[in-house]
């Protein structure tokens, strides 16, 4: 089946008892057992829940993996991933990444002796050099948050395979609608299901998808032990969101393309970051590796922080808010919002300046969003 069809049918057939076409929400914390050593597959909803099981099967299928596990947030998924790496383990991470990920990496580095090296993975030679010393995990965002840099996933996996190093990819910005890292060789895929997978800004959730059944078993134990699991209702909402993921991602892409083209060349704009632009340094990689360019556009304004704030305040259709990937358009100032935990010197070294603005382009009419951006620039 093609991807859009799988979004509808890779979950569960109509309920055999009632004929309901949607997955039931099993709002139960515990389940009756036939005997102390005999049950029907579920005993306690931290360990497993029927609604969650359907979501996990669907996400595993959509990511072309052996299975997946759902969590109560993207950072909950990341925390469970890190629980597999004891003191002294070494992670080689992309240097341009979500501020919350950086914060958790740094906490584990200081408190638990985890070694984390941040490198520019747009250059495969940098990763090759980093892997000359033993590493336990290569951690990638592609596209990155917020600068939308891409990592050549096939090349990164090939380098990691030489040293038998696991590769984990945060696929939140692309989603499996646009990019499937396991098909490119990755071992683990991470999602904040809060974003495009849920798609309606009404849940908090996360997920890990895995290349092998062995990894599913290893992390299922940790999922239960750590306990950062989503509610059945949140699982249902993600399942609902998956139905429209394909059409939404195409709409997001059209909106983002219109906004990016509006920003390019404007006298108040220093740079526009969007993989769909031919001027993007990795546009050719995006065309080869992805099935679209996504709904995020990041712009560096010439007026610095003052220019960014003036622009943000003049937007009418973009709501100033954390998060991204909902049907409504949102605007974020990374330096003071999503990346506020990163020291100024460090974030600026990676390009997260005070003039940087991240636009999550929703599924409104692209022409209206372009007009809104144009008017905000005119008044900024």
Predicted regions and their residues:
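Conserved N-terminal alpha-helix of the aminotransferase class I/II PLP-enzyme fold
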Residues: 30-79, 84, 100-109
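Glycine-rich phosphate/pyrophosphate-binding loop
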Residues: 25-26, 33-54, 58-61, 330-355
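C-terminal core of ALDH-fold dehydrogenases
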Residues: 3, 7-21, 306-346
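PLP-dependent enzyme catalytic core of the Aspartate aminotransferase-like
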Residues: 106, 115-117, 313, 329-380
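Short, well-ordered beta-strand elements within core beta-sheets of diverse protein domains
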Residues: 238-247, 295-302, 358-362
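N-terminal glycine-rich, Lys/His-bearing helix-loop that initiates the first secondary-structure elements
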Residues: 1-42, 49
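Conserved PLP-enzyme active-site core in the AAT-like
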Residues: 68-268
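Conserved small-domain helix->loop->beta segment predominantly found in fold-type I
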Residues: 257-325, 342-348
């Amino acid at each position: 089946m093609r991807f859009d069809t799988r979004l509808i049918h890779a979950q569960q057939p109509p309920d055999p008892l009632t004929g309901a076409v949607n997955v039931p929400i099993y709002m139960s914390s515990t389940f009756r057992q036939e005997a102390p050593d005999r049950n029907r597959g579920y005993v306690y909803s931290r360990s497993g829940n029927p609604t969650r099981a359907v979501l996990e099967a669907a996400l595993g299928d959509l990511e072309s993996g052996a299975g997946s596990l759902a969590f109560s947030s993207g950072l909950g998924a990341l925390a469970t991933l890190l629980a597999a790496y004891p003191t002294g383990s070494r992670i080689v991470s992309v240097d341009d990444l979500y501020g919350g990920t950086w914060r958790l990496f740094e906490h584990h580095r200081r408190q638990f002796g985890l070694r984390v090296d941040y490198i520019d993975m747009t250059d495969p030679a940098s990763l090759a050099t980093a892997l000359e010393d033993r590493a336990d995990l290569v951690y990638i965002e592609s596209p990155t948050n917020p600068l939308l840099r891409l990592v050549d996933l096939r090349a990164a996996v090939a380098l990691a395979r030489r040293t038998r190093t696991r590769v984990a990819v945060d696929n939140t910005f692309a989603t499996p609608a646009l990019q499937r890292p396991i098909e490119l060789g990755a071992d683990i895929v991470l999602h904040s299901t809060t974003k495009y997978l849920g798609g309606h800004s009404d849940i908090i959730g996360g997920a890990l998808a895995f290349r092998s059944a062995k990894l599913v078993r290893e992390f299922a134990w940790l999922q239960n032990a750590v306990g950062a699991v989503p509610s059945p209702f949140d699982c249902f909402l993600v399942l609902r969101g998956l139905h429209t993921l394909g059409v939404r991602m195409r709409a997001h892409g059209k909106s983002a393309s219109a906004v990016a083209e509006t920003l390019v060349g404007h006298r108040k704009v220093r740079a526009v970051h969007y993989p769909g632009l031919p001027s993007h340094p990795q546009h050719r990689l995006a065309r080869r590796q992805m099935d679209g360019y996504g709904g995020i556009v990041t712009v560096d304004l010439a007026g610095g922080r003052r220019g960014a704030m003036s622009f943000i305040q003049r937007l009418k259709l973009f709501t100033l808010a954390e998060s991204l990937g909902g049907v409504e358009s949102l605007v974020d100032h990374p330096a003071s919002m999503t990346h506020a935990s990163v020291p100024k010197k460090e974030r600026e070294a990676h390009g997260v300046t005070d003039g940087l603005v991240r636009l999550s382009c929703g599924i409104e009419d692209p022409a209206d969003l372009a007009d809104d951006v144009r008017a905000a620039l005119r008044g900024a």
